[in-house]
Regions:
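Short, Lys/Arg-enriched N-terminal segments with co-localized hydrophobic residues
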Residues: 7, 12-24
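Class I SAM-dependent transferase core
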Residues: 23-107, 119, 123, 138, ...
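Short intrinsically disordered, low-complexity coil segments enriched in acidic
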Residues: 1-3, 99
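Conserved nucleotide-cofactor-binding alpha/beta core module
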Residues: 99-219
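Alpha-helical interaction segments
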Residues: 6-7, 62, 126, 159
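Substrate-binding/catalytic lobe of Class I Rossmann-like enzymes that use SAM or dcSAM, i.e.
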Residues: 208-213, 220-241
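Intrinsically disordered, low-complexity segments enriched in small/polar residues
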Residues: 2, 16-19, 155, 160
């Protein structure tokens, strides 16, 4: 007789065990558990809701077949055309830093494979996810549909200046780095809205949180330093998202 292993790892930091007192976990769940314990918790991601989310949203379903062996590794994963998934610990840190709420209307710029969008959508009311490449719009939508997320609007378009059509937003998340943040994007936030972007150029980039404290005032906080691929590819003095 087998007893299914049912657990909620991080609500109270307790583990639940099978009838014989031994923890039963398949290899994928073991890798996921190790990712959370060894990479993510040690990088100052301690919010129980975020940690539970990382267990519930199956990262491996957003990883290309040829990279399944490193789906939970502390590394960026190539997708297509110089675009990659961010490392698990960075994705988790970004989500935690936005302090997302169930009522939030959120913009994600850079759909990629859809994983960061899926994490966001699992915590909020609805998400608009924008990517200039129709390949990623289709891929992200398919991946999110597989796990039955239905509160996401996927759009193909240039998100370099945000996305005016569905503004204002309670939160805006850029899934890659920007050399500079256009000032106009801030105005797409609601009052008390948060914007998180990694700003700068290698080797010096900073994860920066901007909060709209009033109609005319914004607060800016540098959270940490990192280096990630840019959302922009430069061609003949223009930036293409």
């Amino acid at each position: 007789m087998q007893v299914r292993f049912i657990f909620n790892l991080y609500q109270n930091d307790e583990l639940f065990f099978g009838y014989n007192g031994h923890m039963t976990m398949n290899p994928i769940e073991q890798h996921r558990f190790n990712m959370i314990e060894q990479q993510i918790r040690t990088w100052e991601v301690l919010d129980p809701e975020v940690l539970n989310l990382l267990h519930q949203v199956p990262r491996e379903k957003f990883v290309p077949t040829e990279y399944q062996g490193v789906a939970f590794a502390d590394t960026e994963i190539p997708l297509y055309d110089d675009v990659c998934m961010l490392s698990p610990k960075l994705e988790a840190r970004l989500i935690q830093s936005l302090s997302l709420q169930k009522k939030d209307h959120v913009l994600v710029v850079g759909s990629g494979s859809g994983y960061l969008t899926a994490l966001t959508a699992s915590l909020v009311k609805n998400v608009v996810s924008v990517d200039i490449n129709p390949y990623f719009t289709k891929l992200a939508k398919q991946n999110c549909q597989k796990i039955k997320l239905n509160n996401i609007t996927f759009v193909t378009g240039d998100g370099s200046l945000g996305w005016l059509k569905n503004q204002p937003y309670d939160a805006i998340l850029f899934a890659g780095s920007l050399p500079l943040l256009p000032e106009s994007i801030r105005n797409q936030l609601n009052v008390n809205g948060r914007l998180l972007a990694i700003l700068g150029e290698a080797p010096s980039m900073q994860a920066t949180l901007i909060t709209r404290s009033s109609n005319s005032d914004f607060e800016e906080e540098v959270l940490f330093e990192t280096v990630v691929p840019s959302l922009y590819i430069k061609h003949e003095n223009t930036f293409v998202f």
